[in-house]
UniProtKB/Swiss-Prot annotation:
A Gene Ontology BP annotation from the UniProt entry: signal transduction
PROSITE patterns for the chain: NAF, PROTEIN_KINASE_ATP, PROTEIN_KINASE_DOM, PROTEIN_KINASE_ST
Organism: Oryza sativa subsp. japonica
Active site positions: 137 (proton acceptor)
Protein name as catalogued: CBL-interacting protein kinase 18
Amino acid sequence: MMELEKNGNILLRRYEIGKLLGQGTFAKVYHGRNIVTSQSVAIKVIDKDKIFKVGLMDQIKREISVMKLVRHPNIVQLYEVMATKSKIYFVLEYVKGGELFNKVAKGRLKEDAARKYFQQLVSAVDFCHSRGVYHRDLKPENLLVDENGNLKITDFGLSALAESRRQDGLLHTTCGTPAYVAPEVISRKGYDGVKVDTWSCGVILFVLMAGYLPFQDSNLMEMYRKIGKAEFKCPAWFSSDVRKLVSRILDPNPRSRMPITKIMETYWFKKGLDSKLILKNVETNEPVTALADVNVVFSSMGSSSSKKTEEKQDAGKLTNLNAFDIISLSEGFDLSGLFEETDKKKEARFTSSQSASAIISKLEDVASCSKLTVKKKEGGVLKMEGASEGRKGVLAIDAEIFEVTPSFHLVEIKKNNGDTLEYQHLWKEDMKPALKDIVWAWQGERQDQQPEDHGQP
């Protein structure tokens, strides 16, 4: 329960709590009102013990610190962070105008309207880049419009707390978000956050002007191929200036892709530009209450359980992946597989809607039943070994858990040592059938996947 005053809806003598706006695995979001200024806010209430237990504390601390650097009129603002023994409270700017792309769903925007939103988007992204902050996941859900018609970017700095909009997370995310991701992210060659954000801005501009995506196909691999080659056509109603700009931004080569600074220098971008937009690209001196010492916010404040879980969090911390990382890990979706040889027989991947602790517990049970010993368990990785040496030494198997969302995980299991045939037999006969209770879907089996045969050839 939230720590409220006696009248039942005043939080820490500062905010009146209103209706529930939404909720996720770790957080509930309420409409709130500052009782001194009467300003409407959004209050995200985080369960402290839950985030300690899954090892998200360090990441959240970093991201709160980031929020101090990105105070801009076109970015949803974090006003304040407060904490009690059991809860953490994020007081955020309340944006009630809805998503920008709800407007696009009603029909494409006129050039002047699209330009205004694009100017605000690019201005905010450039501001963040100047402070070493990169979004890397600009997409429709992250673009809101306030009651004055101004663009507001969400999840700059608080992405770890963003809830999946649908419970199955990955399934819908892979169908929606990849259309906005840069070719270099898909190809797993490493990428520059600045250039990735620039590409996404280009896709967003196209959608605002066209009313549809530049890269779309019912086959995900075909869509990735189009993205990799920047294979798209501008509709007839695009002006020549817009065509040139979009083509230079959606350059599949990040080295020659038009940088944001150059975008802002183009005649098309500067047309009708509000000079205040650029002038406001100066960090404000307005204080951010309670952010001076992030660690104070996350102190146990007398909660022994929180302290104990914090001490243990490094051992249980999972690698946090966004949808693109997951897609890249999946052989069926990985474009690098078109150019590089991979040995599918030595590893397997599946997604699960179970908690990390439940997955680990199941893996330990499977290891025991398969006569494997768990030698090491840290950072979301379980290292398992056989009891005796085979033809090529002791069989060693690693299982690593990656977090997609707090309630959705990817598990990768691969042979680390020993005989491949021995591993394949053990996997097919014992391990894979035993894991079926926690599997949402097997990854990378589109071409050779068959009904479960429990080891029959």
